[in-house]
Amino acid sequence: MVFIEDVEAHEVLDSRGNPTVRATVRLSDGTEASAIVPSGASTGKREALELRDKDDRYAGKGVLKAVSNVNEKIAEAVIGLDAYNQKAVDAEMLELDGTHNYSNLGANAVLGVSMAVARAAAKSLNIPLYRYLGGANASILPVPMFNIINGGAHANNSVDFQEFMIMPFGFSTFSEALRAATEIYHKLKSILNAAGHSTAVGDEGGFAPNLKDNEEPLKLISQAVKEAGYELGSQIKLALDVASSELYKDGKYELEGKKFSSAELISYYEKLCEKYPIFSIEDGLSEDDWSGWAELTKRLGSKVQLVGDDLFVTNEKILREGIEKNIANAILIKPNQIGSVTQTMQTVRLAQRNGYRCIMSHRSGESEDAFIADFAVALNTGEIKTGATSRSERNAKYNRLLEIELEAGEFLGDNI
């Protein structure tokens, strides 16, 4: 048996300059691996708890408490455990914490160790991480969702919707899809410059111009697709992350200076879907508006991918409730929403068994760690959301997927 010999954590910085946890695990055969935990800006109410220090350091965002929990509590609990038994390691940390949302140890402490253990085990066996976690069936390169215009909580601008994305479906390989999306991104920059708009970027690498309404980004992106030489609809489809929980106040949705009921906002989406080839809408309604979600799914669920992010927070129990109530038809997968590799895998398997699509996702606060690229292939999610191709912490994931493409795997494209 190869066992966990040592565990250590440190405070490092994420892409927004905020502290986060880096965990390092050393195994009895000398193998060592690390992992860095991401952090979100727009977060669901029921996410696992991210432990912050709330003192004078880093405006209260330090993570020394989480680091201390790794070094003083988690290390003692997992040292000596079988490194190849991920489920047992994660179960030990969950039991040690004693809560359903890691409010004692911090999900950022637990996830760092969970990821580092998986990475160390794969390295010890001399196999890729995606193969270790997914086995022989890990073979699908995901269709990327490229966030090329940012708004909402991810940007300081006038756009309400949080993300406007392109999805390159009509290509035979991941590398061809990546090239197309990148060329469209650069064309969009030229169009924005020519129109006198800012080309400053948001947290996830997309541009963050001040635009008149939430339809103008769709018009500009459509123009960029065509001018870059690609076909909108057949090769490139569009996707939205509305992050509508951020817009929901007193039972109404406030955007573009107006107030919308759930039914009115659904009608607004229907009109957008008639005008543009929108494949996916994420968090179209608030995480608290389940009756609205039922209506949204009834009206658009057969035509559009309806993704629950804040709605489901990668939580198996909440997803099960959504499945029973016919809410949404897809789930965003963010490991730090639930807290461990094992729990993430359990949620994905439940979704896939019930016909829900899965989208592996980054957070707005990221790092050079590309764990989710391997994770997406391991779980055959078929889709990945990890920003524009303009910031190194985003490109780390795309570059890892390019490496995986050389080793194995097929690109789903239109067969998603």
Curated annotation (Swiss-Prot):
- Extract the Pfam families matched here: Enolase_C, Enolase_N
* PROSITE patterns in the record: ENOLASE (PS00164)
Kindly give the CDD domains that the UniProt entry links to this protein: enolase
> Which pathway does it operate in?
Carbohydrate degradation; glycolysis; pyruvate from D-glyceraldehyde 3-phosphate: step 4/5
Q: Highest taxon of the source?
A: Bacteria
EC id: 4.2.1.11
Q: Which residues bind Mg(2+)?
A: 241, 282, 309
Location of the protein in the cell = Cytoplasm; Secreted; Cell surface
User: What does the Swiss-Prot or TrEMBL cofactor note state?
Assistant: Binds a second Mg(2+) ion via substrate during catalysis.
Q: Which PANTHER family match?
A: ENOLASE
Function, in words: Catalyzes the reversible conversion of 2-phosphoglycerate (2-PG) into phosphoenolpyruvate (PEP). It is essential for the degradation of carbohydrates via glycolysis.
> What protein name applies here?
Enolase
Q: Which gene encodes it?
A: eno
